[in-house]
């Protein structure tokens, strides 16, 4: 609230520890005692924020376009959106990229007058199975990360996956710690 965030509330740190209710130790997992718990990726920062303004610069658009052109299998992930106004442009972006839209129930993408032909609502089943043939090499996420644990696990398991996060509220909600561009 004091920082001027449009969503008032307590401060929250998204630090991915092990599943807190699971009594099973996960080998090689990051723990509170691990020196790597808050580290980035080697000499690189964990995330790179290209633009801290509510508009997109031409340099940022060129960077995103270059990454989209280089990708073979793109997936658009639609997290929580406050307004239905983004549904139409988001569906056009996905159609232009030939990408499915993984739609969180609060994404405003499941209903409305926009093109919903590429909207996937039952993505938990796909994410649980983790089929190699459907694994994306680029994810473009709009809004918050969906609440689906299988989706987060699947995206986290894809080591070479490139993720771009478009977050107009600047919440930087990235629980998978895998997005390279915000």
Describe each PLM feature range.
Residues 1, 180-182:
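Short, intrinsically disordered, charge-balanced linker/junction segments flanking boundaries
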Residues 2-69:
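Conformationally flexible catalytic loops at phosphate/diphosphate-handling active centers
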Residues 3-7, 71-75, 100-104, 108:
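Short secondary-structure junctions and interdomain/linker hinges
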Residues 13, 166, 182:
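Hydrophobic residues at beta-strand termini and immediately following loops
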Residues 60, 78-168, 172-175:
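Glycine-rich, anion-gripping cofactor-binding loops and their flanking helix/strand elements
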Residues 65-84:
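Active-site donor-nucleotide binding/catalytic segment of nucleotide-sugar enzymes
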Residues 72-74, 137-138, 180:
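Conserved acidic residues
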């Amino acid at each position: 609230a004091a920082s001027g965030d449009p969503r008032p509330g307590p401060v929250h740190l998204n630090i991915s520890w092990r599943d807190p209710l699971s009594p099973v130790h996960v080998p090689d997992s990051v723990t509170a005692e691990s020196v790597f718990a808050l580290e980035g990726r080697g000499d690189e920062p964990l995330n790179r924020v290209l633009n801290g303004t509510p508009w997109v610069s031409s340099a940022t658009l060129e960077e995103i376009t270059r990454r989209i052109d280089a990708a073979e299998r793109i997936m658009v992930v639609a997290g929580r959106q406050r307004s239905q106004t983004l549904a139409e442009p988001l569906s056009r972006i996905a159609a232009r990229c030939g990408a499915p839209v993984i739609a969180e129930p609060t994404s405003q993408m499941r209903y409305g007058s926009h093109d919903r032909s590429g909207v996937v609502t039952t993505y938990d089943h796909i994410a649980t199975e983790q089929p190699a043939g459907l694994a994306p090499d680029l994810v473009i996420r709009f809004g918050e990360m969906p609440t689906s644990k299988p989706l987060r696990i699947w995206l986290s398991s894809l080591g070479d996956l490139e993720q771009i996060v478009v977050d107009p509220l600047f919440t930087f909600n990235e629980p998978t710690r895998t997005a390279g561009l915000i």
